[in-house]
Curated annotation (Swiss-Prot):
Residues 278-386 are annotated as: Ion conduction pathway. 3',5'-cyclic GMP binds at residues 528, 531, 544-545. The lineage of its organism: Eukaryota, Metazoa, Chordata, Craniata, Vertebrata. It is found in: Cell membrane. The C-terminal coiled-coil domain mediates homotrimerization of CNGA subunits. The cyclic nucleotide-binding domain (CNBD) comprises three helices and a beta-roll of eight beta-strands from CNGA3 and CNGB3 subunits. Upon cNMP binding transmits the conformational changes to the C-linker domain of the S6 helix to open the ion conduction pathway. Pore-forming subunit of the cone cyclic nucleotide-gated channel. Mediates cone photoresponses at bright light converting transient changes in intracellular cGMP levels into electrical signals. In the dark, cGMP levels are high and keep the channel open enabling a steady inward current carried by Na(+) and Ca(2+) ions that leads to membrane depolarization and neurotransmitter release from synaptic terminals. Residues 388-464 are annotated as: C-linker. Keywords: Cell membrane, Coiled coil, Ion channel, Ion transport, Ligand-gated ion channel, Membrane, Sensory transduction, Transmembrane, Transmembrane helix, Transport. This is Cyclic nucleotide-gated channel alpha-3. Residues 468-588 are annotated as: Cyclic nucleotide-binding domain. 3',5'-cyclic AMP binds at residues 544-545. Residues 1-15 have a biased composition (Polar residues). Residues 129-138, 657-670 have a biased composition (Basic and acidic residues).
Length: 670
């Protein structure tokens, strides 16, 4: 039993929240009995009881309590059980990752149809306790869920069973009669699964405007309108009731069960999208279809031979009265052999004699040609798809080899290049991520990049506590880089244009001689983040301060300075925060020159003033040009108005001129 401190101490908030109602009930019971306990004693007793039950000694504690005197002990025992249940039956949500929360918003919760149609309670009344009167959400199967796929696997088995064994039992009488009980059990078990499958289909949701429909009435209406519903109904017609009249040796009465073939095809389609080896699955699927066709053709050949008569000619199955041809295994294997030779057209079979035999062989030849063409075409395309990446990679190697031979590259360098390509192929690093993800929307690209690079990005100090949008942009701009043994990632004094994050491999910080190692960097380390920020006052500027060399093959992530600055233009606050973090890191390492900061600040002030004057001058020039344009427009309008006035005055002056008046006076005098 756990040891408990018996001194009066303050219990935890969780214990207090559980004990609030319990203490009140206990006080009422104890006050009614005239007994008193201090709060410390009550708390100690309750904690003691809880620990007793947590350690698995609930039975012993219960026995000791019920054998004691007084209802108060019984009430404390019940209250302790209530407290223990509240602690252990309460499921706490896992602590979320704050880093992930910045990429994902609040999770949208799909509202059920009952909640959408629910009306608020009048007067704000609470619903009855225990959830009475509240409808439960209907069970709806999501077609993209794992449960639905598992059910497809389960229903595909009886469909495949019917397609393989019904025709075989119908053609080979011994197979049906010798194992009748087994077939009855399997048949009606398959029928039961067919019935359950109809119920599952009636509760399988579908998408409408991007949302899953969960209304059972709409689901049933949608299902009944499909062709699958009609085929499912036909596949469940109890045609085997004719057994009662014809006997049990007619399994062909159950051929309507073959109409459920769509479930088998759906299972194959979903498996092809889920498997990591789709090409292998396609080849296996094609072989399975071919075997089923050969199997059916063999059974039909034996049935035709039985109809014509065994041994009546050279084409049909030999006489079954002979012991070697009377066995069931020989009958099926002989028929399967004949069917394989006929459909594949690779062997000689006895020629047909009767017309119906000729007709059947002609149909078999046509089907065989189609099967052969299908197999050759599909297998050829599958093999080419399987080797497409290898062929493309080999073409790159061949072009590199030809170039190195043309440029007369040294053998040592040529060997290093070939080994680098071999390493890429052996470790499956030849995939072009941009080419693979180019068809995805930006949101899914970001999600994939976050899942791939999240652990790596979380380790970089300057990128911690950045806003989510900036981190998404940076994650999308990370580029993989692979270095060979002995390659220099950076050298002392080089201008820093990238920062690197080690995903896999080991890098050594070496001296100028390239041999002496100061420190070894391993997975998760990063370097070069300060040089791409252009921290003002840095003694090293944006140049590298160390020589870093790859010990073996190293897989790194690279973030270029141009990509970072392009991203930070949209996030000025984040840019200032990153520069401040970088400055603090440099100050800790005593790599900040205050005089240089002041000088650069003065230079920056002068530059800002010059930029301000230039912008002001540009503004003045723009305003002057606008005013000049307005002045020119007003002058044009004024000239047009003056011209109009002159023309009007000219017309009026011409109408009342002095010459006209003198002529009128002369005419009057005459």
């Amino acid at each position: 039993m756990a040891k408990v401190n018996t001194q009066c101490s303050q219990p935890s908030p969780r214990q207090l929240s559980v004990k609030d109602a319990a203490d009140r009930d206990l006080d009422q019971v104890e006050n009614g009995l005239g007994r008193s306990h201090s709060p410390c004693e009550e708390t100690s007793s309750t904690v003691h009881q809880g620990i007793v039950m947590e350690t698995g000694e609930l039975a012993g504690a219960a026995q000791s309590l019920f054998t004691s005197q007084g209802p108060a002990r019984v009430s404390r025992f019940i209250i302790s059980i209530r407290a223990w249940a509240a602690r252990h039956l309460h499921h706490e949500d896992p602590t979320p990752d704050s880093f992930l929360d910045r990429f994902h918003g609040a999770e949208l919760k799909e509202v059920s149809s009952q909640e959408r149609n629910a009306q608020p309670n009048p007067g704000g009344q609470e619903p009855p306790e225990g959830g009475k009167g509240r409808k439960k959400d209907p069970i709806v199967v999501d077609p993209s869920s794992n449960i639905y796929y598992r059910w497809l696997t389960a229903i595909a088995l009886p469909v495949f069973y019917n397609w393989c064994l019904l025709v075989c039992r119908a053609c080979f009488d011994e197979l049906q009669s010798e194992h009748l009980t087994l077939w009855l059990v399997l048949d009606y078990s398959a029928d039961a699964l067919y019935v359950v499958d109809m119920l599952v289909r009636a509760r399988t949701g579908f998408l409408e405007q991007g949302l899953m429909v969960r209304d059972t009435k709409r689901l049933w209406k949608h299902y009944t309108k499909t062709l699958h519903f009609k085929l499912d109904i036909l596949s469940l017609i109890p045609t085997d009731l004719a057994y009662l009249k014809l006997g049990m040796n007619y399994p062909e009465l159950r051929f309507n069960r073959l109409l459920r073939f769509s479930r088998l095809f759906e299972f194959f389609d979903r498996t092809e999208t889920r498997t990591n080896y789709p090409n292998v699955f396609r080849i296996g699927n094609l072989v399975l279809y071919t075997l089923i066709i050969i199997h059916w053709n063999a059974c039909i050949y034996f049935a035709i031979s039985k109809f014509i008569g065994f041994g009546t000619d050279s084409w049909v199955y030999p006489n079954t009265s002979k012991p070697e041809y009377g066995r069931l295994s020989r009958k099926y294997i002989y028929s399967l052999y004949w069917s394989t030779l006929t459909l594949t057209t690779i062997g000689e079979t006895p020629p047909p004699v009767k017309d119906e035999e000729y007709l059947f062989v002609v149909i078999d030849f046509l089907v065989g040609v189609l099967i052969f063409a299908t197999i050759v075409g599909n297998v050829g395309s599958m093999i080419s798809n399987m080797n497409a990446s290898r062929a493309e990679f080999q073409a790159k190697i061949d072009s590199i080899k030809q170039y190195m031979q043309f440029r007369k590259v040294t053998k040592d360098l040529e060997t290093r290049v070939i080994r680098w390509f071999d390493y890429l192929w052996a470790n499956r690093k030849t995939v072009d991520e941009k080419e693979v993800l180019k068809n995805l929307p930006d949101k899914l690209k970001a999600e994939i990049a976050i899942n791939v690079h999240l652990d790596t990005l979380k380790k970089v100090r300057i990128f911690q506590d950045c806003e989510a949008g900036l981190l998404v942009e940076l994650v999308l701009k990370l580029r993989p880089a692979v270095f060979s043994p002995g390659d220099y990632i950076c050298k002392k004094g080089d201008i820093g244009r990238e920062m690197y994050i080690i995903k896999e491999g080991k890098l050594a910080v070496v001296a100028d001689d390239g041999v002496t190692q100061f420190v070894v960097l391993s997975d998760g380390s990063y370097f070069g983040e300060i040089s791409i920020l252009n921290i003002k006052g840095s003694k090293s500027g944006n140049r590298r301060t160390a020589n870093i060399r790859s010990i073996g093959y190293s897989d790194l992530f690279c973030l270029s300075k141009d990509d970072l600055m392009e991203t930070l233009t949209e996030y000025p606050d984040a840019k200032r925060a990153l520069e401040e973090k970088g400055r603090q890191i440099l100050m800790k390492d005593n790599l900040i020159d205050d005089d240089l900061v002041t000088a650069r600040a003065d230079a920056r002030n002068i530059e800002e003033k010059v930029e301000y004057l230039e912008s002001s001058l540009d503004g003045l020039q723009t305003r002057f040009a606008r005013l000049l344009a307005e002045y020119s427009a007003s002058q044009m309008k004024l000239k047009q108005r003056l011209s109009q006035l002159e023309s009007q005055m000219t017309r009026r002056g011409h109408g009342f001129s002095p010459d006209r008046e003198n002529s009128e006076d002369a005419s009057k005098a005459d």
